[in-house]
Amino acid sequence: MRTRIRRGVAVALTVSALTFTAACGGSSDKGGDKADKGKAAEQPAEKPAAAPLTAEQMKAGILEAKDLPAGWKAESAPSTDDQAKAEKPECQPLAQLMSDKIDGATMGGNQEFASADGASLLAQQIFTMPGTGAADFVKSVETAAAACATFTMVQDGQPVPVKAAALPTVKSGESSTGVRLTMEIPELKMKIESDVLIAQQGSGVMRLAYVPMNGEGHKAFDDLAKRGGDKFVKAAQG
């Protein structure tokens, strides 16, 4: 079975200013009353939609081996059109974390890495979504993690039972969430645990997933997530 992991970069939203208008009344020659003509009501300008991330921005947000602790090396990250499907619709955002394509997204750069001993894997992917899609995607993952403690995913035609749990980790970008996905493979007597950070900046999303060789390896995730998140946000902000 193949395990896929991806991450994403993002663009900064522009902050808009409030406009304010006031008019002052004059006084009469005889010292009459001063009239206040009133103020125009303050109205916040609509926040403009974030521009899509460019291919250059998405590429710039991808980690390189030199950005990681010693021993990590880059590996090829072949992309396909495979899309994992959850049997329960409310769990689909979690299944999408293990897909090569994200519905409604323009996919950008991606890179995978292996630890020095080849036992731990790290993968990052960046993509951009129109409108509020990026922020909505992060929220949908957070909601699904709370609603889908267990679910069944179909990947490569095979049903795979998955456990999901919210994962406290570093914050990144304008919004982010962490989730741990656990897949049991009885035939291989194997359990795969993947720690995932989903971060949003403007119209961009980063997926950073880490599969450690054992339970002790999970403690390295926060550092790896911060490295990936920092680079993605910097690239997204241009």
Each model region followed by its residue ranges:
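Bacterial Sec-dependent N-terminal signal peptides
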Residues: 1-9
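N-terminal low-complexity, Pro/Thr-rich disordered segments
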Residues: 8-12, 18-60, 75, 85-97, ...
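Proline-anchored loop/turn motifs at beta-strand termini and strand-loop-strand connectors
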Residues: 63-71
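A small/polar (G/S/T-enriched), proline-flanked helix-loop surface module common
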Residues: 72-190, 218, 224-225, 236-237
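Short, well-ordered beta-strand elements
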Residues: 122-125, 203-212
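Short, solvent-exposed coil/turn segments at beta-strand boundaries
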Residues: 172-174, 199-205
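Mobile, glycine-rich extracellular loop/lid and propeptide segments
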Residues: 192-200
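A short acidic/glycine-rich loop-to-helix N-cap element
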Residues: 208-224
